[in-house]
Structure formats: structure tokens, C-alpha cells
Amino acid sequence: MTIFEALRHDHDTQRELIDKLIETSGDTKTRHALLEKLKHELQEHAKFEERYFYDPLIFKDLTQEKARHSIAEHHDIDELIEELESTDMSSPAWLATAKKLHHKVHHHLDEEEQEVFQLAGRALSDKQKHDLAQKYDANMH
């Protein structure tokens, strides 16, 4: 398995969770549980993705700009989650913020897979791609 396959697997989980979250309504146990699960998944993924994927990329000219941009998007996503947690789940404002988060997560994941992965594929050796996947997977799962 390469780092790209490992990350893509978790991206699929994140897409599924955020898609389910915006289909919920009201201040329900389901909505609370999905938000907590999504928050945990996104935070853990960002932590280990930054450590085992973006850290080696930030020092390479080819990938430095994209790595910094993606890390900044992780922080934007964290802020939207904080906003959701401080908003009444039954209010229209909560759903509006959840939809912003949905858009941001999908945009971020698509951009990583379509742009960052291609550049990283050229910047990392085959050995690095496999070694980083093992380290990421061992910590994430």
C-alpha cells in the first residue's frame, strides 16, 4: 500500500460521514454522534497526514506551496467544526455551517487527490510512498 492509497481510504470515510451529517435534522442523538465521529476522524487524519505526508513535502520545492495550502485548509476545517459545536443544532445556522463544512471537506479532499497526490508522486520515491503509508496507517488505525 502507498501513502496515497492509505489517505484515499480515510478520505472515503470522511466523505461518507460529512454526507450523512448534512442529511440529519434537529438536535438529535444521530446528529451529535455523527458530528463527534466526523470531528475525531478529521482531527486524527489531519494530525497524521501532516506528520507522515505533508512534513516530507513541505521541504521540497515542487510540493511546498500545495503542502502549506492543505495544512491551512485543515485549520479552516477545525474552525468550522468549532463553529458547529457552539451553534444550536436545531437552528438554521447550524445546517448552514454544516453545509459550508461539507463543501470545504469535499473541496479539500478532491484537491488533495487530484493535485497534491500527482505532485507528491513525483517528489517521493517508491520506498518513501510505502514507508510513509506504513507509518500513517500504524498511527491512524
Task: Report residues per predicted region.
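Small-residue-biased structural context
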Residues: M1-H141
